[in-house]
Amino acid sequence: MAQAVWSRLGRILWLSCLLPWAPAGVAAGLYELNLTTDSPATTGAEVTISASLVAKDNGSLALPADAHLYRFHWIHTPLVLTGKAEKGLSSTIRVVGHVPGEFPVSVWVTASDCWMCQPVARGFVVLHITEFLVGDLVVTQNTSLPWPSSYLTKTILKVSFLLHDPSDFLKTALFLYSWDFGDGTQMVTEDSVVYYNYSIIGTFTVKLKVVAEWEEVKPDATKAVMQKTGDFSASLKLQETLRGIQVLGPTLIQTFQKMTLTLNFLGSPPLTVCWRLKPECLPLEEGECHPVSVASTAYNLTHTFRDPGDYCFSIRAENIISKTHQYHRIQVWPSRIQPAVFAFPCATLITVMLAFIMYMTLRNATQQKDMVENPEPPSGVRCCCQMCCGPFLLETPSEYLEIVRENHGLLPPLYKSVKTYTV
């Protein structure tokens, strides 16, 4: 293999040295090559590469009428050439790769009578050869959702495996398919197409393992069972359409009373919710309200009404699949608690002020009365002692009464004198 690579490099270097000495009569730079290939391919399968000579200015330049004036040159080592065909101004080759890897294939066009002349056009393509099966896992559903990899729950999905084998290398092989749908369901089939229905929302990965077996005749005329495998997967996002919005909340409320509505969405999040109060139940127009992102299937909406009247909550919700509208009527009555709320503090304040005024008035009146009844307040310790402690310091009650009469001369005598007559 190393010798073949060095041989190819030597040939390219040799051509690069000879090209500058080629005549310039050929229309170099006016044409280009369009290359197509059916790569990637599995090892042992044929790969087709085609090259077509076209004008660079998208067709305004006329192509040569005689196709025999030009010749195509290919370099495809270490790939094995299995076929070559030329028709008009195009050339096609078929090659086979027996080891996996990335392999460049080069092609250029020269005048047919001067293959060492400067190329009219050149190009190259890289072939991808793998030891595994080549194919695609395709998921389809009878819906027209504009979002890639998004599908509906409770709707049949068609999952297909499309084998990429343009050379029919595996036309005699038997295939076995092992499916894993990512929700715990697994199955093994001999058919490359299955139908499945997801009942829950979420993101799932469908995994498929393909095994191909066939018989191959060896050079010694013996038969051997050959096998190739391949692993494929596809990511699916299962969504639910919004079937409606359930609104839980009062339909009658008073002003200045906080109201809470609970919105239950019958669909899969994430959602975009928008609402607005209107006199009538009419759908919301675009840009009429501010959208709110909701990551669950429930949302609480709060509002306080200041004016009585009839209102309607216009609610709109949407996810990446669908949208829906809902309405909720509510009547707002004037609040009965509102006057009492303002009157009670005022009445309390007035009552406190009146009580304080009455207290101060009675206090001043009591002080003035005491001053009138006692114009000359007693002085010294003697008066205080006589008034307060007299009954305890005097020996007899008669002495206490005499002292009282001295201090209160205006009081009448406590008893009248008794006269005694002797006959």
UniProtKB/Swiss-Prot annotation:
It is found in: Golgi apparatus membrane. Keywords: Glycoprotein, Golgi apparatus, Membrane, Signal, Transmembrane, Transmembrane helix. Gene3D superfamilies: Immunoglobulins. Residues 1-24 form the signal peptide. Pfam families: PKAT_KLD, PKD. GO terms for cellular component: Golgi membrane; plasma membrane. PROSITE patterns: PKD. Glycans are attached at N34, N197, N300. It comes from the Eukaryota. This is Transmembrane protein 130. It comes from Pongo abelii (Sumatran orangutan).
